[in-house]
Amino acid sequence: MSKFKILSMFSSAGISETYFEDIGLEVVVANELVSERADYYRRLHPNTNMIQGDIVDKEIYDKVISESKKCGVNMIISTPPCQGMSTLGKKQYYNDARNELFWHTLNAVEDLDPDFVFIENVPKFLKMKFQYSKMDLTFEEILNEKFSDKYVVESQILNAKDYGVPQSRPRAIIKLYKKKYLWPWPKKEDKVVTLRDAIWDLPSLESGEVSSIQWHRALKVSDMHREVMSHTPEGKSAMTNEVYYPKKKDGSKVKGFHNTYKRMKWDEPSPTRATNNYMISGHNNVHPGREREDGTWSDARAMTLREVIIVSSLPLDWGIPATLTDKEDKFVRLLIGESIPPLLSKKIIEQILIANEVNYEKL
């Protein structure tokens, strides 16, 4: 019998759950709104009961709760979509329908009475305020108002690079756990894994080139992008080049920030892999490259999907198709860009097993 029976809310493709089975966790029920993401979840987690539909719909919510009760769910993981808090002001947060999704996590905690709850989101989430009982409170404050008699409520911002992931990706983590249990935070690793450690051995590729290595193929880039990035050194942005900078069709310079059209650094972790990680013009998206004898730089491209998989701590035997079209490649990148690196979620949750000496079933 599995020690944990988990409900995964707002699960997308379930990337954060990749290593759960390795530590004895069983996700028995999952819910995702978007059918394309739900289908991918079923591909990656065929043994989980995926209930596709809008959790705001009472029929869907009731089905999720009913199936969770049948399966004996004792843990909830929840990653509500965070787009609604990226650029809006405080009053707009209250009215953004996407932010109503947080309340369904609270409802599920009330209805299922789990022993553990794991909530993760963008760092800004911890400071965001909601209206609750005529007060403006953070989500953590609301959790304490509702559940502090039964649960310990804790939060931190953890960066994946501190826990063995070759990517700098800070995430807001909120934990709820019943007071008879322990759930410490994971300790930081002594060594940071760099891009040199992670992807140096992969062969160089230019625009449109394909290697014999699975998922190591370069998406095509424009001639202009290839030219400007081949004249941009490791760690630098083409926006600062005096001659070879991004241009519009009329020859004028493209407007952009200092971290656009920018190469990464070999001796640092990858910057955060966002959903647009295939775009040269995105933030810190370009391969570090290697200097050639003529002074130009190789790999004038974004990371290949294989490189994104590696820096996101996903396994190289991951269950996605071996061959992907460009559209499919970009969709998988989108899924990865939306997700917490799975090694980080594993290290956070396995602390329950370690701290309670794997005696969870006896408590």
Regions found by a protein language model. Give the residues of each.
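Beta-sheet entry/capping signal
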Residues: 27, 115-116, 270-272
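Hydrophobic alpha-helical packing residues
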Residues: 20, 146-148, 352
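Short alpha-helical patches at coil-to-helix transitions and adjacent helical residues
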Residues: 13, 136, 171, 338-346
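C-terminal target-recognition/interaction regions appended to catalytic cores
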Residues: 223-363
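Class I S-adenosyl-L-methionine
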Residues: 63-70, 82-260
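Core alpha/beta nucleotide-donor-binding catalytic domains of modification enzymes
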Residues: 2-112, 123-130, 134-136
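Aromatic-acidic/polar surface patches that form glycan- and anion
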Residues: 9, 30, 163-167, 262, ...
